[in-house]
Amino acid sequence: MIPPNASLVKYDNPVLVSRNTEKKTPRARALKTSPQQPTNAGPVPNPPPKGGSKLPPVESQKAQQTDEILNSILPPREWTESGQLWVQQVSSTPATRLDVVNLQEQLDMRLQQRQARETGICPVRRELYSQCFDELIRQVTIECAERGLLLLRVRDEIRMTIAAYQTLYESSVAFGMRKALQAEQGKSDMEKKITDLGQEKRELERQVNELKAKCEAIEKREAERRQVEEKKHAEEIQFLKRTNQQLKTQLEGIIAPNKK
């Protein structure tokens, strides 16, 4: 028989439930069961002697009511091994001062063994303290059912609040992850855009350099053409001046004899 994980909550001896059992009473001892050795979840009291005196009707009814309340607060643990169903009910034995001291020692020891963090969010620490609180509720419920039920409401409220905070935390983490992915995607897009703009800039610079080279070639060609034209025009002017001087000399030579 392999018991479930050890817990700080005090349980009775695990019992083997018959395979043909369809309905279980509030306490597993009322079934056709075979008691086994206790687990290491904590000190387990010795079972009451079979030949002992029976409880008065009022006490028996009160004990049954306490058992039902305990089962509603802390449901029995069930597991299957080799096709057999095992059930372990939470203990209804009142706690002594030694049990409380032992609970504290067990809590400290398991916190150290499982290396629970002392601060911050720690699932291990939360689990162990939840088990400790459940054991305290069990102890209080046996002494006063009303006080135990009130503590149950406190426990459920705390769990609901923690669950709400956990949901909020998970949604915040998911939101942060989405934003991080969006930022990463935006970063990739911006890097690609920067690369494209860099290539476009280099292409434009190449075109500018080509146009500058063309402009310089055109300016050089036009300067050379202008020099050729200026030289040609200067030669034409000199030719026209010489021609004009020759014509003037000829004209003067023609006019001078006529005056005589």
Curated annotation (Swiss-Prot):
Post-translational modification: May undergo some post-translational modifications that shift its mobility on SDS gels.
Key word rRNA-binding present: no
Source domain of life: Eukaryota
Record-level GO cellular component terms: axoneme; ciliary base; dynein complex
Coiled-coil residue windows: 177-260
Pfam families, per the entry: Ax_dynein_light
GO molecular function: dynein heavy chain binding
Disordered: annotated span: 1-66
Keyword Transferase assigned: no
The entry's keywords: Coiled coil, Dynein, Motor protein
Main function: May play a dynamic role in flagellar motility.
Family classification: Belongs to the inner dynein arm light chain family.
Protein name in UniProt: 33 kDa inner dynein arm light chain, axonemal
Organism whose genome encodes this protein: Strongylocentrotus purpuratus (Purple sea urchin)
